[in-house]
Design a protein with these regions (language model features):
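PLP-dependent enzyme catalytic core of the Aspartate aminotransferase-like
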Residues: 59, 63-67, 71, 94, ...
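Active-site phosphate-binding strand-loop segment of PLP-dependent enzymes
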Residues: 151, 155-208
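Conserved PLP-anchoring active-site segment centered on the Schiff-base-forming lysine
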Residues: 118-137
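Conserved N-terminal alpha-helix of the aminotransferase class I/II PLP-enzyme fold
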Residues: 63-111
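PLP-dependent aminotransferase class I/II
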Residues: 243-312, 317-320
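Conserved PLP-binding catalytic core of the aspartate aminotransferase-like
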Residues: 297-306, 313-348, 358, 362-363, ...
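N-terminal "arm"/small-domain region of PLP-dependent enzymes with the aminotransferase-like
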Residues: 6-7, 11-72, 204
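Active-site PLP attachment segment
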Residues: 219, 225-260
């Protein structure tokens, strides 16, 4: 295809995104991540960040990173399967196992890479994956990369999952049930107790992505700990990029499972090892989350979430089924959602409009994410702006 044709093709596709209101506008952040930040030149309250425990700019993480960089250098110099597996990475993987309360752990460059590599590694042709309707895109892509068949069950619908297991279990060798623990657009929690019972009854492997539960629920150990089913989950997936304030993905499981993943997950085998600085920061983040200070940060996080959720509800906003610091304000209209997000930013509140295809049409929303570092005046400022422009736009 000629260069001019390529340009015209994607220019046309871009125009279509603009016309449908689906173009993703990116704002420049000019300061460290925190409850407040400088975005596009103005100071704003940040309600669009995964930085739940306010650790992303913690000086202890920065010191750990600097010390590791001085000791090991910046880059690892090789893929980790060959010569990039530094001793500090082995230390991190022991910490992952401790954090996830499993026999062993493995680190991936991103959470996306953890799902995209691990899911295909676990299944073969002749296997079946049962996946929640609202699972994260990294799970969806991991399933697509596998050779297994897939069946989608209705969101958090245990009866539908049971029906699909009953009708299909005997047709396949292995069955893998995959679910988010905390769903990223609604902030609701998967019914893991019931799902775990079904996995046991039908001899299925249970894979739980706890990206938004790590460091948030279960005294920091995540959603399975919160619900008392840690030992019922076979594969524990998580991230460092949210509550832990750093970068990377992790899997915790039995030692044999982890070693098999290490030998079969292409996103691990074919990736360059992480900078030692990132690894050291991750170790420090786990230590903080598992300390008494971490528990205090989690308590403050949930107090802020409850305050803000009740505040939005009292104004007349629909917050859906949120049970976590992810608190949607569901608008149900693309144009109004974008207008509200723009108005809030002008008022000094940084939020992001979430519209189709990220969510279904008619459920467009602003996803608010509070963190442990927000002061009450930050949340009150945001609620005041929501009230002002919610009324002005006819949303409330």
């Amino acid at each position: 295809m000629a260069k001019k044709q390529i340009r015209e093709l994607y220019a046309s596709k871009l125009r279509e995104l603009y016309e449908r209101g689906e173009f993703w506008e990116i704002k420049r952040v000019l300061s460290p991540a925190g409850p407040r930040a400088i975005v596009e030149g103005r100071e704003v309250v940040v309600l669009a960040s995964n930085n739940y425990l306010n650790l992303a700019n913690d000086p202890r993480l920065k010191r750990a990173a600097i010390e590791a960089m001085e000791k090991y250098g910046w880059g690892p110099g090789a893929v980790w399967a060959i010569a990039g597996y530094h001793e500090i990475l082995a230390e991190l993987e022991k910490k992952i196992a401790e954090f996830k309360r499993t026999e062993a752990g493995i680190f991936f460059p991103t959470g996306f890479a953890a799902n995209a590599g691990t899911i295909p590694a676990l299944v073969d042709q002749g296997d079946l994956i049962l996946s929640d309707q609202l699972n994260h895109g990294s799970i969806i892509d991991g399933i697509r990369l596998s050779r297994a068949e897939k069946i989608i069950y209705n969101h958090c619908d245990v009866a539908d999952l049971e029906d699909k297991l009953r009708k299909n279990r005997d047709k396949y060798n292995k069955v893998l049930i995959v679910t988010d623990a905390v769903f990223s657009m609604d902030g609701d929690i998967a019914p893991l107790r019931d799902i775990a019972k079904l996995a046991e009854e039908f001899n299925a492997v249970l894979y739980v992505d706890d990206a938004h539960g790590d460091g948030v629920l279960g005294d920091g150990h995540g959603t399975p700990a919160h619900l008392g089913v840690e030992d019922k989950v076979d594969i524990h997936m998580g991230t460092f990029s949210k509550a832990l304030g750093s970068s990377g993905g992790m899997i915790g499981s039995d030692r044999e499972v982890i070693e098999y993943i290490r030998n079969r997950a292409r996103t691990w085998l074919l990736s360059t090892g992480p900078p030692p600085a990132v690894v050291a920061a991750n170790i420090k983040a786990i230590e903080i989350v598992m300390s008494p200070e971490g528990k205090d940060r989690i308590r403050r996080l949930h107090a802020n979430a409850e305050y803000f959720r009740k505040g939005l509800q009292s104004l007349g906003f629909n917050t859906g089924k949120s049970q976590t610091p992810i608190i949607p304000a569901i608008i149900g209209d693309t144009k109004k959602t974008r207008e509200l997000a723009k108005a809030l930013f002008e008022e000094g509140v940084f939020v992001v409009p979430i519209v189709y295809p990220m969510v279904a049409r008619g459920t467009e929303r602003i996803r608010n994410q509070v963190n442990a570092g927000h002061a009450r005046e930050d949340l009150d400022r945001a609620l005041s702006a929501y009230e002002k422009y919610g009324k002005k736009l006819g949303i409330i």
